[in-house]
Amino acid sequence: MIIRSPESEVKILVDRDPVKTSFEEWARPGHFSRTLAKGPETTTWIWNLHADAHDFDSHTSDLEEISRKVFSAHFGQLSIIFLWLSGMYFHGARFSNYEAWLSDPTHIRPSAQVVWPIVGQEILNGDVGGGFRGIQITSGFFQIWRASGITSELQLYCTAIGALVFAALMLFAGWFHYHKAAPKLAWFQDVESMLNHHLAGLLGLGSLSWAGHQVHVSLPINQFLDAGVDPKEIPLPHEFILNRDLLAQLYPSFAEGATPFFTLNWSKYADFLTFRGGLDPVTGGLWLTDIAHHHLAIAVLFLIAGHMYRTNWAIGHGLKDILEAHKGPFTGQGHKGLYEILTTSWHAQLSLNLAMLGSLTIVVAHHMYSMPPYPYLATDYGTQLSLFTHHMWIGGFLIVGAAAHAAIFMVRDYDPTTRYNDLLDRVLRHRDAIISHLNWACIFLGFHSFGLYIHNDTMSALGRPQDMFSDTAIQLQPVFAQWVQNTHALAPGATAPGATTSTSLTWGGGDLVAVGGKVALLPIPLGTADFLVHHIHAFTIHVTVLILLKGVLFARSSRLIPDKANLGFRFPCDGPGRGGTCQVSAWDHVFLGLFWMYNAISVVIFHFSWKMQSDVWGSISDQGVVTHITGGNFAQSSITINGWLRDFLWAQASQVIQSYGSSLSAYGLFFLGAHFVWAFSLMFLFSGRGYWQELIESIVWAHNKLKVAPAIQPRALSIVQGRAVGVTHYLLGGIATTWAFFLARIIAVG
């Protein structure tokens, strides 16, 4: 008799037509909530509508339904992203000087927006070179387009239309997977299949197809562009793909086809898959052949990683087993129970993802300038500054979001009855030790880092420069950072056999790379000034973490409010008769954390902006003499607080303040307006609810007198709503002020 292994049943993983498609709901604002659907009685209704519209947890407690709504919303998000991308490419095709820039990227500046002549706004169309007038853009799109091999505005048009089609497709998918074929809960919880598809599919095949595009399209086209061939003379992408001889003229190994691959003679391909390190001296970007090699390697890694987990066949890892095997000497049950948490709480899952993605985004910010990936990116100082600032802000917001969703998980999804002695339980049980130690670290860092500056300001004020902490008096050299720099500068020969230079010029040792008389990158010296500001970074980051982590660890209970979990994620105070219990909800910790995140990121981007202008960016003469934008003043000026105010904020604000009457005047208006938005936030943050309620009631009285009283009763914002409006305007105003300040400065001098 033949014993067969039982065939794995194909599971039905979707429900057909679960939710009727109907536009009637659209006409009923708040249809997802019994209270809101009744319509407004007071003005609080509109605030609650905004607060709860996307809080799917509050619509239903059915995890499957929540999962479907989130899944469907993701398609909507993708649709918006495609629409945005399409708009960017369309502007490149219709309103830009891309083809002119392509012919002379060192002298012509990128522009993709031309202002219409209404009320004199056309003053904003500055001369960007090549006879084109428009607004200079700093998004880096031109550099990406060149790196990917786009040579004409027609190609940008086609891509824009393609993105539009994809946007429509995503909208359709969002509708289809909620109304027509909605996945069952089991599908959302099948983590091994998800890892398989995300690792092997998205990251593996995604990287492989990008590597393929780079090898067959980007590399040959960029070879021609670098050699000065007119973009109109370069063969079109499909010609390189279809005609191997064309590629073989540029990369001889193509003549041999796949033979070297199958005979394991892979080094033959070293003409287009390189391992050089450093920057291409023609473009000031990473070697595109290095980048293609990198994506091929990443593809191989992720294709393997995607096949490590057990799906329909009885081979491979199970995530549950892996997690439960994790037991350290001090962690009790270890990761037991984490699998259940992460497959039933999307907040817990999202929290981890946001923390990872936020950290990764900040890593991207630091690599964009130290290893500029695209041609002519490094010499476009406005774009370099914008990319760094943008990725730092985004990273900061994502990390605060991680804490927010971790706290929501604790309040809504954490079940203390089933969690005993696992990792999370043990962390919660010694949370007092964690928070008090972290608090001590913050106090230590704050007093010492700030104290060094105060010392320097005092000595400077008293005319005693020899007693200051500086590179020319009492030195505090960042010896560990310098050691890391030197190790990397000397590393290439020892770590990577074929590499000719270190990963980044910033480590030191190498020469500078200049393109068209502008510095692309050079070794970045670190000294006492960097030592001081780095400890301010440590201080602000630790305080942000203290606030956010305290919010998470005390989200369910504290000595002050033992039953905090019953009050929910956001609440103003613990009811009447309990003084001193305001601002303790998990939401309030996120609110407070946002301000410290803003502090932390501001210091980072100020440090970056000034350091690069002082020690890196600048012009180079025919004799090889480098003249930096601010002439190397960072080391001596930034060691006092007065120096930061005088030589950075005030000195560099002159461009934005004096921008009226020039093409940069919009930044002058934004600078003013954003300050106003920021100041407006203080009205919400520094006032009490009762003050406004009293004011409203006297205004309503006046309306009643004139018989024009509204049917919907006006109400002051709740405490939480007021804080939400306050922090939003604080951040929006602060970020837009910084944006105007940075761009007016760097476009004028860079």
Curated annotation (Swiss-Prot):
Q: Does the keyword Thylakoid apply?
A: yes
Give residues annotated as binding phylloquinone. Answer: W692
* Enzyme Commission designation: 1.97.1.12
**PROSITE patterns, per database record:** PHOTOSYSTEM_I_PSAAB
Q: Give GO MF terms, alphabetically.
A: 4 iron, 4 sulfur cluster binding; chlorophyll binding; electron transfer activity; magnesium ion binding; oxidoreductase activity
Give the organism the record lists.
Answer: Platanus occidentalis (Sycamore)
Annotated residues for binding of chlorophyll a': H675
Q: Which GO terms describe its cellular component?
A: chloroplast thylakoid membrane; photosystem I
> Where in the cell is the protein located?
Plastid, Chloroplast thylakoid membrane
Which NCBIfam families does the UniProt record give?
psaA (TIGR01335)
| Gene Ontology biological process terms from the UniProt entry | photosynthesis
Q: What is this protein called?
A: Photosystem I P700 chlorophyll a apoprotein A1
Q: Does the keyword Thylakoid apply?
A: yes
Free-text remark on how the cofactor is bound = P700 is a chlorophyll a/chlorophyll a' dimer, A0 is one or more chlorophyll a, A1 is one or both phylloquinones and FX is a shared 4Fe-4S iron-sulfur center.
Identify the residues that bind [4Fe-4S] cluster. C573, C582
